[in-house]
Every structure is written in structure tokens, then in C-alpha cells.
Amino acid sequence: MNNTEIIENASKVLEAIDAAKEEELRNLNSLVQPRAPLNAGSTPGEIINEIKHLSTRDQEGGTSSKDEEESGAGRTVAEGAATRDHKYSKSRPKKQPRSGLQSGAAGKNPTPDGEGGDTCNRELDQHSDGDGHSNTEGASSDLASIQPCQTDDAPCSSTSYLDEEDEPAVRPKTQCKQSGLIESKEDEDGMLSELHEQHKGRSKRLSALGRVNSSPIPSPRPDELLKKGHRREYSMVWSNDGVFIESWCNPMCARIRPLPIREICVCGRCPLKCSKCLLDPE
């Protein structure tokens, strides 16, 4: 934007503000008829005094006239402010697009009034050098990216950054978190169904084989090892090396009691001689 355009816009704004100020003064003069009318050179103090005079006169005259005049004054002030804002919005300069792509996108939709052509002309002017020579290379590259509309009613197609020959996007396969392998949707559903069946509630009554497979044999507690005459599937005996160890033998003769090494069974695992050892001396 040149300096001359900035100065012109500023002058238009000032003119709009002065016009709004004069209109507000005329509205105040219409309300204050008995006293001397206010002019454009009135100070803010004089305007405030006039407003105070109106308020005191309304209080003496009655509440009805006061409400009517206040509503009228409020409407006039609001209308004046709306007019000022409307004029100021009209006088404000419009922002120009900085890049050639933005200006091209804004002007690629031609209208009967020729707005699209004006946009293209402004685009060429923006690409011109300071000496007046136009930069035809930049303008041609920008204009090449603009796609013309097929019909006047149909909207223009946006610039596509993908080639027409590209294949459509395909849903990627999901990765299984447990196995670390890439599985398809069907495999994932089958795996979920199998897990659901595995975690279903089992029956409380189990057979002997099921109990053996499901629950392991509990290890003995230290206080149970000290009980005498308690039948278990294990026994604490003295080994030939003189070490008190845990041995597994016939439950009928497996009595937990510390015995000296001379009283060990023939098999070397039972505290006393049992029927099994007598029948099978080996």
C-alpha cells in the first residue's frame, strides 16, 4: 500500500468522524430548544451542562416526560454511533492477499461483472517490478495453478496436491500387541473369541485328574515338618552322609521324626523297615 492511499484512507476516516459528531450535535440541539443551540465548536463541558439541565427539567416536569426524552436521546445516540461505525467500516481499506496463490484462489471464480478478471489484473500488477516491468514467469506459474470452472453454476475445483494416478487409501492392518505380528481384522476377531472362551467360568467340581492338573502339590510348611506320627507323602530322614533330608516313599511308613543314622531303613529313605522294603530288599 502506497503512502497516498494511506493518507486518503485516513482523511476519509476523519471526515466520517466529523460527520458523526455533527449529527450527534444536531440531535442534542433538537432536544434543547429553549436554550441556545450547540454548534460544532462547543466544548465537552457545555455538552455536559446541557445534559444536566435536561435531567433537572425532566425531574421537575414529571417522570413520564423524562422517560420519553431519555429513551429518545438513547435512540439518537445509538443511531449516531451505528452510523459512525457503518461509515468507518466502509472507509476502512481492505487487506490485499500477499501471495499469488491466495489472490489466484480468490479470483479464479469469474462472475458476470468481471470480478475474476480484475483479480487476475491485480495479481499481475503485484508481480510487476519497481521499474514497471511485469514478472511474467511468476504470474504464469500462479495462473497455471488456477483451474477453470466447467460451468458457471458448478463451483470451482480446488487445487489438488495429489496425482490423479495415486491409488486410494487402504485401511492399514492392525498390529497384535500380544504376538507382535500384523494381523488382519478376521484374525483379530478370531483371537478375541478364543480368549473369551478360555476365560469363561469353569465348573466348580473337577475330577481327580483335573484336580491334579489344575492344582500342584502344596509344599509342606515348617511347622508340619516337626509333627510326629503325621502321615505324609514325604518324610524327613537321615541320609548316609548324616544329613537330615526330605525323602519320598510309601505314605504308610513316612513318619516325620528325627532318627539316628543307625535306625535308617534298608532302602535308605524310610525311618523304619516297611512292607515294601521287606518284600523287595533291593
Curated annotation (Swiss-Prot):
**From start to end residue, where is composition biased (Basic and acidic residues)?**
49-60, 120-134
Q: What does this protein do?
A: Blocks host interferon signaling.
Source species: Tupaia paramyxovirus (TPMV)
Please provide the Gene Ontology terms (biological process) for this protein.
Answer: symbiont-mediated suppression of host cytoplasmic pattern recognition receptor signaling pathway via inhibition of MDA-5 activity
Does this UniProt record's set of keywords contain Zinc?
A: yes
Polar residues: which segments have biased composition?
135-161
Ligand binding (Zn(2+) 1): H230, C249, C274, C277
Report which superkingdom the organism of origin falls in. Answer: Viruses
Reply yes or no: does the keyword Lyase apply: no
Alphabetically list the UniProt keywords.
Answer: Host-virus interaction, Inhibition of host innate immune response by virus, Inhibition of host MDA5 by virus, Inhibition of host RLR pathway by virus, Interferon antiviral system evasion, Metal-binding, Viral immunoevasion, Zinc
Cystine pairs annotated here are none
* Molecular-function annotations in GO: metal ion binding
Q: Which residues bind Zn(2+) 2?
A: C253, C265, C267, C270
Record's protein name:
Non-structural protein V
Q: Where is this region: Disordered?
A: 29-225
